[in-house]
């Protein structure tokens, strides 16, 4: 029997937590930055409107403001983020005792042995978890559902925000093969650039490479 793995990724986590205290800013570009008062430091997180303006995580504040002059900068509150992360993880723990955190805002849940307790429908359970986190904590997440951890993570990245994507035995080739090779876990910018020099730009092209 295939395993049933969820990868849960909280959307724009730092920014989303800050916006719980600033609901009036939800529709404007917002970023959490290292030192917004002095305009030094880097962008730690951004919301969807800021993302649409081209603001990127890890770029400098001045670069972000150049792209998006009306960007609202908020200071980081790391203790608060840990508190919300713990609350979300406590919800996950109610569905499986096989939860594995991946950073402060991502987790894998192996629900293989507990799925039958919640109706047996993996997508329905993923949706229920999303809706519960949103209802109880005011945060959205994307969930990838698959038969292994790598594909589950690709699924959570496939559609954002607040969405569930199922990558199954039946559809995985049509979803996974066309994705950029950089979407793979642990394939960073340097590796992606090197692979590109050999004409490998998609996961499917990488899979077709000879092992030699």
What is the predicted role of each segment?
Residues 1-212:
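Gly/Gly-Pro- and Ser/Thr-rich, intrinsically disordered tail segments characteristic of DNA damage-repair
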């Amino acid at each position: 029997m295939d395993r049933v793995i969820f990868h849960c990724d909280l959307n724009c986590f730092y920014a989303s937590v800050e916006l719980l205290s600033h609901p009036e800013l939800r529709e404007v570009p917002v970023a959490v930055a290292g030192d917004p008062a002095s305009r030094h430091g880097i962008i730690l997180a951004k919301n969807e409107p800021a993302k649409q303006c081209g603001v990127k995580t890890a770029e400098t504040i001045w670069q972000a403001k150049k792209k998006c002059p009306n960007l609202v900068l908020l200071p980081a509150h790391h203790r608060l983020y840990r508190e919300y992360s713990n609350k979300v993880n406590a919800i996950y723990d109610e569905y499986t005792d096989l939860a594995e955190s991946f950073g402060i805002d991502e987790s894998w849940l192996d629900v293989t042995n507990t799925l039958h307790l919640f109706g047996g429908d993996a997508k329905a359970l993923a949706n229920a978890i999303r809706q519960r986190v949103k209802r109880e904590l005011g945060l959205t997440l994307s969930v990838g559902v698959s038969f292994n951890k790598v594909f589950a993570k690709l699924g959570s990245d496939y559609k954002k925000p607040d969405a569930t994507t199922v990558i199954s035995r039946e559809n995985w080739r049509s979803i996974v093969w066309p994705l950029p090779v950089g979407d793979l876990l642990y394939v960073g910018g340097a590796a992606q650039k090197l692979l590109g020099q050999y004409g490998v730009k998609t996961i499917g092209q990488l899979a077709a490479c000879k092992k030699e």
